[in-house]
Amino acid sequence: MTTAQFICLSLGSNLGNRFEIFRKAFALLKELEIEDLQSSIILETKALLLPGSPKEWDLPFFNSVLIGKTTLSPKQLLSGVKQIERRLGRDVNALPWSPRVLDIDILLYGDENHQQEDVKIPHERITERPFLLSLIASLCPTRIFHKPGSEYHLKSFGEIAHLLPCPQEMILNSFSPNTLLMGVVNVTDNSISDEGLYLEASKAVAHAEKLFAQGASVIDFGGQATNPKVQQLLNVEQEWSRLEPVLKLLAEKWAGRRQYPDISLDTFYPEIIKRALEIYPIRWINDVSGGSKEMAEIARDANLLLVINHSCSLPPRPDKTLAFTTCASDQLLSWGEKQIEAFVALGLRQDQIIFDPGIGFGTTQIQALNVLHKMKKFRKLGCATLVGHSRKSCFSLLGKYDAKDRDWETVSLSVLLQQQGVNYLRVHDVEANQRVLSAAAWSGVHV
């Protein structure tokens, strides 16, 4: 029986939606006979370029380090990671040092040295990348570096990272690898926390740019407020009059971008999605009504992700809530199982469905906080999970604060949700949540 060997890999990307590329790479690596896969945080760094490189190559890189165990030989592992690179869109004919969708390097393989033409382990530039040394040390600080002839031979990675510190100016940002953020852009005049700020298309798109720069993997545009204070919902034409200018401006300004987030529309009208797809390649439907048959069919045919958000009424009403005699999370789990079964029967793939428990859409404040503490339960659904807890009224149980002043409670719960394996968090303050999540994930997370 072959003994599983410790391995250490690095991932890099500076094209496309880098968060989603990493997420897909994690999944494919687990299929490649790699067990107990753990990721460091993601560090965004300046591109390392040769003098005279084209200006358009100067795109920031996402970098992470992964550790795990495998029975694959070094050559088998190399072959496998190269297949993953190609599968996720890497151009094998691209020039060296040019931007790339995904770069996977084998940094370490057990304590062995492999210095063959096609496999060089430890990686020959490992000590020239201080940000990688820092990430390796975050995962396995006492692991010994084996490379005879190197001045760092037989030193621990904790010590090497101390001797070769990463210059502060090299690191642009740090991000959580396993819990991604959906930034909120309310194109409305009656949202509770930011009413009227982004009604103009130019302001909505500028805010989306800001959220993306702060680390949002997805930007969720909504033209309809669905909070408890709403008296009358907008019809299709009213909602579309708000979203159409935003989508047209996105198509104008973001066409040809080499780094970008996914775009989501927060709507329960299938007609809105049909019209939007003619203007901009949105990737997500965020349906607070829970998803209709028609919406599921659109997602299926256009290969979109569909967020199914549980709700008891729209807008939420205090007399329409989950039952009080049964555990709230159990009720939501049962609803999720039925919805997913129905949508899969329509031909929607399970990996296209994202479950949202609908915090505030039929949960009382106490039920909402209880559900947030039991999100691990929804792993049973076999699909990704998303939570929209940002600035919700349930935090009023903790103190009397205006909605816009509930970010302390939001980020605290974000860490708890990260620890429970929630895949996406829908938040207003992307920067605060991202900084807290990356700090909480410093010593690594399972992916």
Curated annotation (Swiss-Prot):
Cofactor dependence is on: Mg(2+)
Task: Drop me one GO molecular function for this one.
Answer: metal ion binding
Per its UniProt record, what CDD domains does this chain match? DHPS, HPPK
Q: Which Pfam families has this protein been placed in?
A: HPPK (PF01288), Pterin_bind (PF00809)
Write out the catalysed reaction.
6-hydroxymethyl-7,8-dihydropterin + ATP = (7,8-dihydropterin-6-yl)methyl diphosphate + AMP + H(+); (7,8-dihydropterin-6-yl)methyl diphosphate + 4-aminobenzoate = 7,8-dihydropteroate + diphosphate
The UniProt annotation places (7,8-dihydropterin-6-yl)methyl diphosphate binding at 226, 266, 286, 356, 392, 426-428
Quick one: a GO cellular component term?
cytosol
User: Which residues are Mg(2+)-binding?
Assistant: 186
Give the Pterin-binding domain ranges.
179-438
What is the name of this protein? Folate synthesis bifunctional protein
* Region entry HPPK, spans: 1-165
In terms of InterPro entries, this protein maps to: DHP_synth-like (IPR045031), DHP_synth_dom (IPR006390), Dihydropteroate_synth-like_sf (IPR011005), Hppk (IPR000550), Hppk_sf (IPR035907), Pterin-binding_dom (IPR000489)
Q: In which pathway does it act?
A: Cofactor biosynthesis; tetrahydrofolate biosynthesis; 2-amino-4-hydroxy-6-hydroxymethyl-7,8-dihydropteridine diphosphate from 7,8-dihydroneopterin triphosphate: step 4/4; Cofactor biosynthesis; tetrahydrofolate biosynthesis; 7,8-dihydrofolate from 2-amino-4-hydroxy-6-hydroxymethyl-7,8-dihydropteridine diphosphate and 4-aminobenzoate: step 1/2
One of the GO BP terms on file: tetrahydrofolate biosynthetic process
| Keyword Lipoprotein in annotation | no
- Which top class of enzyme applies to this chain? transferase
List where this protein forms a coiled coil: none
Q: Where is this region: DHPS?
A: 181-447
Q: What is its EC number?
A: 2.7.6.3, 2.5.1.15
Question: Family, per the entry?
Answer: In the C-terminal section; belongs to the DHPS family.
**Which keywords annotate this record?**
ATP-binding, Folate biosynthesis, Kinase, Magnesium, Metal-binding, Multifunctional enzyme, Nucleotide-binding, Transferase
